[in-house]
């Protein structure tokens, strides 16, 4: 019996185009001047320290780090430091009303229904926990943060690594077979399944012919009772 649902964001709750055409360009355009101005701010300084450790360049100056971050964005690297800095920049965008977090219309009602049924809801995304909270806190459906019991990012591991799902299950103290992971990416679901989780693939466009996971096109097509250990 499912006790908790963990959902991905990009391509699952949220149109991938919002991330790629709104969020990513917004951060890219502002990254250089933002870091030059705010490099001494505590949360920015901590992210830059993490970046120096990640690239094993403890003495790298700000211009070197800026170049590195732009390279990471070009590569779409799932860098924890990059995600933290993007999240800090996006915060100002949400607060200023430059954009609101996109959610597919089927998402909010179903999340609310699951919560009312007593299911715990969590988010696991490559984006930083702060960025996740911003997207759901300033979504086009309002502030949805009260629906969620917690958030996970790459601090628990990469989304295609089995150990990440083992870590989440351990932190939640819930048996893996009682956890359901929702994602649009087959390889992420493969990793969750190998960790003993239940899985469901959200297909917002064309079906994934290579996937062995249950596929649905909307959140309200997910039958929680259909998942058994």
UniProtKB/Swiss-Prot annotation:
User: What is the reaction catalyzed?
Assistant: 5-methylsulfanyl-2,3-dioxopentyl phosphate + H2O = 1,2-dihydroxy-5-(methylsulfanyl)pent-1-en-3-one + phosphate
Matching HAMAP family, A to Z? Salvage_MtnC
Subunit details: Monomer.
**What single Pfam family name could you report for this chain, choosing any that match?**
Hydrolase
What is one Gene Ontology biological process annotated in the Swiss-Prot or TrEMBL record? L-methionine salvage from methylthioadenosine
Taxonomically, the superkingdom here is: Bacteria
According to UniProt, this protein's pathway is: Amino-acid biosynthesis; L-methionine biosynthesis via salvage pathway; L-methionine from S-methyl-5-thio-alpha-D-ribose 1-phosphate: step 3/6; Amino-acid biosynthesis; L-methionine biosynthesis via salvage pathway; L-methionine from S-methyl-5-thio-alpha-D-ribose 1-phosphate: step 4/6
The EC number(s) given in the record are 3.1.3.77
What family is this protein classified in? Answer: Belongs to the HAD-like hydrolase superfamily. MasA/MtnC family.
**Identification of the protein by name:** Enolase-phosphatase E1
Respond yes or no to whether keyword Magnesium is given for this record.
yes
What's the name of its gene?
mtnC
Question: What is the enzyme's main class?
Answer: hydrolase
| Stated role | Bifunctional enzyme that catalyzes the enolization of 2,3-diketo-5-methylthiopentyl-1-phosphate (DK-MTP-1-P) into the intermediate 2-hydroxy-3-keto-5-methylthiopentenyl-1-phosphate (HK-MTPenyl-1-P), which is then dephosphorylated to form the acireductone 1,2-dihydroxy-3-keto-5-methylthiopentene (DHK-MTPene).
Entry keywords, A to Z: Amino-acid biosynthesis, Hydrolase, Magnesium, Metal-binding, Methionine biosynthesis
- A molecular function (GO) term: magnesium ion binding
What is the cofactor note? Binds 1 Mg(2+) ion per subunit.
The UniProt record lists the keyword Magnesium? yes
Required co-factor?
Mg(2+)
């Amino acid at each position: 019996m499912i006790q908790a649902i963990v959902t991905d964001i990009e391509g699952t709750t949220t149109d991938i185009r919002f991330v790629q055409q709104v969020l990513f360009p917004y951060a890219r355009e502002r990254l250089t001047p933002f870091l030059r101005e705010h490099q001494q701010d505590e949360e920015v300084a901590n992210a830059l320290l993490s970046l120096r450790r990640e690239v094993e360049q403890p003495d790298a100056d700000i211009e070197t780090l800026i170049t590195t971050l732009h390279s990471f964005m070009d590569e779409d690297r799932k860098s924890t430091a990059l995600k933290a800095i993007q999240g800090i920049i996006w915060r100002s965008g949400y607060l200023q009303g430059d954009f609101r977090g996109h959610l597919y219309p089927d998402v909010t009602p179903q999340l609310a229904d699951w919560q009312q049924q007593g299911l715990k809801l969590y988010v696991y995304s490559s984006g930083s926990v702060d960025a996740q909270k911003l997207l759901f806190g300033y979504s086009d459906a309002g502030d949805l943060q009260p629906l969620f019991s917690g958030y996970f990012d790459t601090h628990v591991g990469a989304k295609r690594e089995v150990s990440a799902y083992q870590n989440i299950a351990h932190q939640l103290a819930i048996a893996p077979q009682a956890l359901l992971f929702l994602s649009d990416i087959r390889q992420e679901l493969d990793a969750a399944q190998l960790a003993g989780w239940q899985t469901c693939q959200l297909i917002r466009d064309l079906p994934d012919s290579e996937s062995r996971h249950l596929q649905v096109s909307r959140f309200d097509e997910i039958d929680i009772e259909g998942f058994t250990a």
